[in-house]
């Protein structure tokens, strides 16, 4: 395949691609609360490392101040401290790697496109961004499942089983001392089971709406009905506080090149992506599998 370009310019679209992908992702992302704003960087050069974070594994020790006569004084002079043993605090640089790739490779022929060339390029970048967002949504769902610190299994969607699940997880979050509000991203099967529960009545302060098939919260958890295709196999729900997962994409290139074999341009883009969470936050993610769904 020839790479000659007859001295014609290569037009770069990294900035446009970055802006469109970022806007589309924020508008249509699944698991919207759990993920922070997507980090998109154009012109990346590292082929593996996305960024580094400062981490600290030094445990916190609650000490007691000693007033013993032989600590720091008497026989303990110059060889002991009333503050107790001293621990050194050191931060490590932890690299975060890319773990998947994205690409675009399309041709736009002036002779057949039946539209303005620049308008067609903008349309394709938008449509590609929408498709790539759906792909990233699936990857985030798989990432949440793989990194959940706790797994619960729901035997069925009966009212008693669902109520027990939420009661158990309410106690789990209280005892784990997760103070941030927790959102539940759940498939329609579980969401509808909660909406249809006989216990959800206005006399108990429930905001359930049969007309709109809606229920904002249950047992203190915010409910977000989420498409089934974004969950890992057998998973019916993900519980998580907001903002603890960072999705990121590095754009290597986005360009058009004048084609040799037809009267038009070749639209190409290459990018890498990944997802990150601190180990400390994994205990705050709970996945719920369903026997009925093969979990």
PLM regions and their residue ranges:
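Extended, solvent-exposed, turn-rich assembly/linker loops in the middle of proteins
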Residues: 146-219
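Alpha-helix boundary/N-cap detector
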Residues: 8, 12-15, 123, 127, ...
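Short, extreme N-terminal leader segments that mark the start of a protein/domain
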Residues: 1-29
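Long, contiguous amphipathic alpha-helices that act as assembly "spine/axial" helices in icosahedral shell
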Residues: 87-152, 223, 260-271
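Helix N-cap / beta->alpha transition motif
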Residues: 103-110, 184-190, 220, 227, ...
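Extended, compositionally biased alpha-helical segments that mediate assembly or anchoring
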Residues: 2-13, 242-295
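Assembly/oligomerization interface modules of large self-assembling protein complexes
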Residues: 20-100
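Intrinsically disordered, low-complexity segments enriched in Gly and acidic/Ser/Thr residues
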Residues: 208-244
């Amino acid at each position: 395949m020839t790479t000659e370009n007859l001295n014609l310019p290569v037009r770069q679209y990294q900035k446009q691609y970055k802006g469109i992908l970022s806007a589309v992702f924020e508008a249509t992302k699944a698991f919207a609360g759990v993920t922070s704003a997507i980090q998109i960087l154009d012109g990346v050069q590292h082929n593996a490392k996305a960024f580094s974070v400062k981490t600290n594994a030094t445990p916190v020790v609650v000490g007691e101040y000693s007033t013993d006569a032989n600590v720091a004084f008497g026989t303990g002079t110059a060889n002991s401290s009333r503050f107790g043993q001293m621990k050194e605090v050191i931060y490590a640089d932890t690299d975060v790697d890319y773990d998947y790739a994205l690409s675009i490779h399309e041709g736009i022929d002036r002779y057949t496109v039946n539209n303005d060339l620049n308008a067609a390029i903008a349309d394709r970048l938008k449509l590609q961004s929408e498709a790539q967002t759906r792909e990233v949504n699936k990857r985030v769902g798989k990432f949440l499942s793989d990194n959940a610190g706790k797994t619960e299994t729901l035997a069925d969607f009966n009212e008693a089983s669902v109520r027990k699940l939420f009661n158990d997880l309410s106690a789990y979050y209280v005892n784990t001392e997760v103070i941030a509000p927790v959102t539940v991203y759940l498939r329609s099967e579980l969401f509808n089971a909660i909406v249809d529960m006989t216990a959800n009545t206005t006399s108990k302060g429930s905001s359930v709406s049969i007309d709109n098939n809606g229920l904002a919260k249950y047992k203190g958890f915010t409910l977000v009905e989420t498409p089934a295709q974004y969950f890992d196999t057998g998973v019916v729900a993900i519980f998580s506080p907001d903002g603890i997962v960072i999705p990121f994409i590095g754009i290597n290139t986005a360009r058009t090149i004048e084609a040799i074999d037809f009267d038009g341009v070749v639209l190409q883009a290459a990018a890498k992506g990944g997802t990150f969470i601190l180990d400390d936050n994994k205990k705050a993610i709970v996945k719920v599998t369903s026997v009925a769904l093969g979990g």
